[in-house]
Amino acid sequence: VYVDLVKDRYPGKALYQTPMTKEVARCQLALDLAREGKTVCLVCSGDSGIYGMAALVYELRGENSEPEVEVVPGLTAACSGGAVLGAPLTHDFAVISLSDRLTPWETIENRLRCAAEGNFAIAIYNPASHGRPDHLKRACDILLRVLPEERLCGIVRNIGREGQSSRILTLGELQAADVDMFCTVFVGNSSTKVVNGALITPRGYRNV
């Protein structure tokens, strides 16, 4: 899907796609093509250094100095989605993915619990997919052991794309929300509030 979003900008260029779970093959292909003297761009969503392919490229290249690798910073969903809702991440926050394909669910549970106990605002990536439709509900069950049902949250879908939508709701409502892999979920901290329709987490400036 990421190549489909950009292919019209680069007419005449060779495009290569690999399916999900083939990330190693995708990165290795990029390195092999670069070693042939080609200029290669490995396309990721958001920022390639945040749940992207940047680290994997460095791992596969190993201690070799060739080919040269340049990581171009992008705009991750925590930032772009937060801007759609307002400013929910203005203070300390955690970013947690609910995908257990590469991370054990027990580790994800622990990270959710620690973030809630630390009163962090939380940006949640990969809240659901066809293979794990109940992961957000399970995550909410964990958060609700620490946080109140009325804790403010937000959902943004298709950030920056056609059909973008957003919603502000409570943690209790989030538990039953309809989400998919195109959604990013935000859970506020104890100071998060709604001001004129915007979800914000104050930094703590005095006299405001």
Give, region by region, the residue ranges found by the protein language model.
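Short, well-ordered secondary-structure micro-motifs
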Residues: 28, 53-54, 81-83, 106-108, ...
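Class I S-adenosyl-L-methionine
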Residues: 1-69, 80, 175
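Short, acidic/turn-prone active-site loops that include or flank metal/cofactor-
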Residues: 1-3, 17-25, 75, 95-102, ...
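General beta-strand structural signal in soluble alpha/beta enzymes
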Residues: 17, 42-44, 69-74, 89-91, ...
